[in-house]
Amino acid sequence: MSNKNPLNNSNGSNSSTIVNSDKFLVKIHSLSVSHTSKSSNIYLVGDFDQFKQFKTETKKSSSTHGSCIYNEFAMEFQYETKYIHKLDHKHFKICVYKKKSIGSDKYIGSFGVDLYTLATGPISHDVVFQKDNTGVGRLQFRLEMNHITDIQISFKSILLSNLMKQSNYQIDYSLNKINPLKSSIIENTICPSWYNQSSILMNISLKDLVDGSIFFNLKDTKSSKVIGELKLPVKSIFSFVEGDIKIVKTLLYNEKQNKICDACIEIQFNNIPQLAQLRGGIQTEQGIRGAESFFSGVPLPKIIGEISNASTSDGYSKEAQLQHVKLPDGWESRIDPVSGKVFYLNHNNKTTSWISPLEHAPVKKRTPTVVISNTTILDNNNNNNNNNNNNNNNNNNNNNNINNTNNIQQKQQAQQQPVQPPPQPVQQQVQQPQQKEKEKEKEINAEDYKISRPKKTPATPEEAAVIIQRTFRNHKKQSYNKTIRNSKTIIPPNNVQQQQPQQTEKPSIYQVFGQQIDQGLPNGWEVRQDQFGRVFYVDHINRATTWTRPTVKHPKQHQQATLVQQRK
């Protein structure tokens, strides 16, 4: 069954702005009540955000536990809303009534829950329904609420190489083998390449997407045979980031599982659903029990995600609640032997992170930074960040804002897509951009690969911005500046940071040159020593510094220069 929301109907010329509605597939079934009026005719009335209403048939409750089971009831519909960010202000309510032969029916009690909890929590519910804030019975039901969007899977490039023979090739691709798309035919080649192929468009939920696979079939058009196949599980490459781009390096095999060719595929996911329900578990009046987070980064219900650290009325704190929610499939928590802190290991893509996959971040667009090789995610972030930091240090006067933006984006990406290992703190990256040797870390063997101990990152993007600004100002004060505004603090002419000598006591300028240091210098010049013991020369007339010792001009030239200076 489907029902259109009348609020979505436009009035033609009166509508100036079109707002797209988010859609949810809702299914309600397995309703039952217990511990209520015994041997009574009971029926239920439901209201889903004033969008869809229902009423069950009347059944007689048992004489022992006062229970009624409505196995025959099941309802499906498509719910639409323009305000997905306000689901916590929308509610689903079930009222329990006792049918009377004479007079109006008796209201027994009701239960209500917000739609955000339904869209992010478990499917099963076993809760207390109340009347005047007093529990009068129990209500059981299952409610599936799947956020669906028109997902777009784009293929920026499909590159094949090392084919056995030169021929004409075509490749078709699909999601879950539904409506496969075909590429153009590349003739007389052993390395066919396709760029910007038609995108896969499918109205699907996040669960169906992540649990699905992308299939590729390579066809030799001369023989009209499929010579190679590839099944790419979405779970192995997907990250809960809008516009994320993955570069997959893998192999195509024939029916006998023999290698046919190498493949490099660039895939992008757009318009992904934002919400998904937990796997398994049940919701009760005491919270959620036995559930598993669907995927890293997917929002959690408020009953878990927004409970304060203090114990709740039923004695459960936020940490206690989280213990009843399992990590997503393929995730494991471990304790760092050095710091004693808990970190998280993702066996799906062999990465580590300090951030729990149960903590979600808002959907953000980002540039491609992750490469996947043989179903293993490789880290390109460190090299890119080091290059960016080197360039920023060489252009200090122009790139302050770029530094701030890059580091804030780096923090957001670290939360949304863990890397191996997590990036270094921003302050260390800026102060030491050319540092090649890193501190050796203890490594933890995890099956057939090694995972380095994660490194700590700033807590928030704002904290990272403060650190980068403070570091930039300190670095700028120490860099080369031709204009000397304070003669007491003259900066030597050095725009490249150099290592400090190992000696603890550096010789003074008088120990190096004796008493002849100021002799032989032109008028207005002075010799000084920097913090590393190096000698430089200060031109007070032009307000400049140099490493080169100035030479005394010929007396005639010196007199001419003096006259010119006096005229000025």
UniProtKB/Swiss-Prot annotation:
Keyword field contains Cell cycle: yes
WW domain sequence ranges: 325-359, 519-552
Protein location: Nucleus; Nucleus, Nucleolus; Cytoplasm, Cell cortex; Cytoplasm, Cytoskeleton
This protein's UniProt keywords: Calmodulin-binding, Cell cycle, Cell division, Cytoplasm, Cytoskeleton, Nucleus, Repeat
Cited SUPFAM superfamilies: C2 domain (Calcium/lipid-binding domain, CaLB), WW domain
Domain of life: Eukaryota
GO MF annotation, one: molecular adaptor activity
Main location: nucleus
Bias-annotated ranges (Low complexity): 380-418
Disulfide bond entries: none
UniProt region (Disordered), positions on chain: 376-461
Effect of a null allele: Cells fail to complete the final step of cytokinesis and form multinucleated cells when grown on a solid surface. Null mutants show excessive accumulation of F-actin around the periphery of the ventral surface. When grown in suspension, mutants lacking dwwA complete cytokinesis normally. Mutants lacking the N-terminal C2 domain fail to localize to the cell cortex.
Annotated C2 domain residues: 6-129
UniProt record, GO biological process: actin filament organization; cell migration; mitotic cytokinesis; negative regulation of organ growth; regulation of DNA-templated transcription; regulation of hippo signaling
Residue ranges with Basic and acidic residues bias: 435-451
Entry's Gene Ontology cellular component terms: cell cortex; cytoplasm; cytoskeleton; nucleolus; nucleus
Pfam families tied to this protein: C2, WW
PANTHER family, per the entry: TRANSCRIPTIONAL COACTIVATOR YORKIE (PTHR17616:SF8), YES-ASSOCIATED PROTEIN YAP1 FAMILY MEMBER (PTHR17616)
Quaternary structure (record): Interacts with calmodulin in the absence of Ca(2+).
Described purpose of this protein according to its UniProt entry: Involved in regulation of actin cytoskeleton organization and cytokinesis.
Protein name from the UniProt record: WW domain-containing protein A
Organism: Dictyostelium discoideum (Social amoeba)
Gene: dwwA
